[in-house]
């Protein structure tokens, strides 16, 4: 997802009436579309001194590399990279082979209430961490994402209270959640581009595949109970669009190298989130 934006070029030739009779051979490449280099052409006409013609810079010479989704904004670049890390069963753009148990189709999962509770508790720790970083930070990049409407920690608190009322014991956070939480804290201090990658993938993945997983798990073990974790105050599509615009705005200030660094963090985001998701099946 490459684009070529033509750039007007000009050919500067010393003024000479004899040049009106000069034409480029049809078998020769048009000098305006030669490969990136300065082309020097020597021409002798009617025994006159050789004339030097300098071909102008071509559009191809000036055209910078385009990244998949770049023309639509940086969020589309992040989406493109994320989708490629899915399996074919998870997304049509997926390129990853199914290896881990949580990567199998959800219909084949065998979730347990105990495992689901571990997943919810560890998820809450991650969302608590994200949202506390955003709310308490004076860093301008993070300030853009305060009170987006996508926040999940409070919703998860409500759900865990419901499970407690049903007689379930709420477990303590496990290693996957604690490890991810600590990693996010470290990134927030020293690597804002990488942190934003995790912010995007955590919230946007939950609003898409996360909802589907929640629905399927509820069908299997919760008698179709819809948890607050999968509900939003307001129109979800608009909340997501608002955050997309903020993300694109923030990324406009980044260099290409910083953008690439953000994209490269996607795989780690999937790794940490996958370890927490796997708890559902534990």
From Swiss-Prot:
Q: Name one Pfam family in it.
A: Heme_oxygenase
What compartments host this protein? Plastid, Chloroplast
The protein's UniProt keywords, in alphabetical order, are:
Chloroplast, Heme, Iron, Metal-binding, Oxidoreductase, Photosynthesis, Plastid, Transit peptide
Organelle targeting peptide span = 1-54
Keyword set includes Ubl conjugation: no
Knocked-out gene: effects = Long hypocotyl, incomplete chloroplast and leaf development, lack of photoreversible phytochromes and lack of phytochromobilin, the phytochrome chromophore. No cotyledon expansion in response to bright-red light. Increased levels of jasmonate (JA) and constitutive expression of JA-inducible defense genes. Increased sensitivity to salt stress and no acclimation response to salinity.
**What protein is this chain from?**
Heme oxygenase 1, chloroplastic
* Species of the source: Arabidopsis thaliana
Source species taxonomy = Eukaryota, Viridiplantae, Streptophyta, Embryophyta, Tracheophyta
């Amino acid at each position: 997802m490459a684009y070529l934006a033509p750039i007007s070029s000009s050919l500067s030739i010393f003024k000479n009436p004899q040049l009106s009779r000069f034409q480029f051979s049809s078998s020769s490449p048009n000098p305006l579309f030669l490969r990136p280099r300065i082309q020097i052409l020597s021409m002798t006409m009617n025994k006159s001194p050789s004339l030097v013609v300098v071909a102008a810079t071509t559009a191809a010479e000036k055209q910078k590399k385009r990244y998949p989704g770049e023309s639509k904004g940086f969020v589309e670049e992040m989406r493109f990279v994320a989708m490629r890390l899915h399996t074919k069963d998870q997304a049509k753009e997926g390129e990853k082979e199914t290896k881990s148990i949580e990567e199998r189709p959800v219909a084949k999962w065998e979730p347990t209430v105990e495992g689901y509770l571990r997943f919810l508790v560890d998820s809450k720790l991650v969302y608590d961490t994200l949202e506390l970083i955003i709310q308490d930070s004076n860093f301008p990049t993070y300030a853009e994402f305060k009170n987006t409407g996508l926040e999940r920690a409070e919703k998860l608190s409500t759900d865990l209270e419901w499970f407690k009322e049903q007689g379930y014991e709420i477990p303590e956070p496990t290693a996957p959640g604690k490890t991810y939480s600590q990693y996010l804290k470290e990134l927030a201090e020293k690597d804002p581009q990488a942190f934003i990658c995790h912010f995007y993938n955590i919230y946007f993945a939950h609003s898409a595949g996360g909802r589907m997983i929640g629905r399927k798990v509820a069908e299997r073990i919760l008698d179709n109970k819809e948890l607050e974790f999968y509900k939003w105050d307001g129109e979800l599509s608009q909340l997501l669009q608002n955050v997309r615009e903020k993300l694109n705005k923030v990324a406009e200030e980044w260099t290409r190298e910083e953008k690439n660094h953000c994209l490269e963090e996607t795989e780690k985001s999937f790794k940490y989130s996958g370890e927490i998701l796997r708890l559902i099946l534990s």
